[in-house]
């Protein structure tokens, strides 16, 4: 009988959103842009998932000045690539760590025979950097679905549906771990029972569709999480 836990990354495995915000600002500065995303603005921008999509949203909805004439899509791709380099440099420099309880959950779940997977909108490079620094690599995770591996990012269910396909499991045999409403809507739309551990940018969001909301994962024995999965035949 096979069961799996599917993890989001940013805000779930680690409070990385603040590091992402600073990496965006570093990329903007390197590009000679006067843009600066403070915490209040970034919280608003997090309504959109995906870094390139977030930059596009900022340009279109916040009247961002300084966009060069020509191919805006190419400009956004270049800017996002610079941001990814800045982010991975920060992570490699030890500026992030796992959220309390995550390391213990991964270890305990593995000891109980759970399969582990990742479903995230962040880039594979970002996932590799984070897991390399915090866990010594990606070996704990059998399946990693990241970045542009699907056409539609969260809150669409695509990335979770891809993870289920690669795991060859029904949604009922899995539980998802998320930190945001967009992530919750994505996993629930894929039919997966979902545990939410709110992060610094997502506390106060509506998590009414969650099977379980846990403010302090480190204070749990994880049995309530495991109980949400139905063993597959």
What are these model-derived regions, one by one?
Residues 2, 107, 123-233:
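Asp-based, Mg2+/Mn2+-dependent phosphohydrolase catalytic module
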Residues 2-9, 13-100, 107, 111-112:
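N-terminal helical cap/lid subdomain that shapes the substrate entry/recognition surface
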Residues 12, 120-122:
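Conserved phosphate-coupling serine/threonine residues in phosphotransfer and NTP-handling enzymes
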Residues 38-40, 69, 119, 174, ...:
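Residue-level detector of family-conserved "landmark" positions at structurally sensitive sites
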Residues 70, 74, 78, 93-100, ...:
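Residues at secondary-structure transition points
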Residues 115:
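Short beta-strand-loop/turn "lid" adjacent to the catalytic site in phosphate-handling enzymes
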């Amino acid at each position: 009988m096979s069961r799996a836990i599917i993890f989001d990354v940013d805000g779930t495995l680690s409070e990385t959103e603040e590091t992402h915000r600073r990496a965006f600002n570093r990329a903007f500065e390197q590009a000679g842009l006067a843009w600066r995303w403070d915490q209040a603005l970034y919280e608003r921008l997090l309504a959109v998932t995906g870094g390139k999509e977030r930059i596009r949203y900022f340009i279109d909805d916040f009247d961002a000045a300084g966009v060069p004439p020509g191919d805006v899509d190419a400009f956004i791709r270049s800017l996002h690539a610079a941001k990814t380099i800045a982010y991975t440099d920060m992570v490699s420099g030890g500026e992030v760590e796992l959220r309390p309880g995550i390391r213990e959950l991964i270890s305990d779940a593995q000891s109980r025979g759970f399969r582990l997977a990742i479903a995230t909108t962040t880039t594979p490079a970002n996932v590799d950097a984070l897991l390399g620094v915090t866990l010594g690599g990606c070996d704990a995770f059998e399946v990693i679905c990241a970045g542009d591996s699907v056409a539609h990012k969260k809150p669409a269910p695509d990335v979770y549906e891809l993870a289920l396909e690669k795991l060859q499991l029904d949604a009922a045999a899995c539980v998802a771990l998320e930190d945001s409403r967009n992530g919750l809507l994505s996993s629930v739309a894929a039919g997966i029972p979902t545990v939410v551990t709110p992060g610094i940018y997502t506390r106060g969001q509506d998590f009414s569709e969650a099977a379980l909301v846990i403010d302090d994962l480190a204070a749990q024995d994880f049995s309530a999480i495991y109980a949400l999965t139905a063993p597959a035949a």
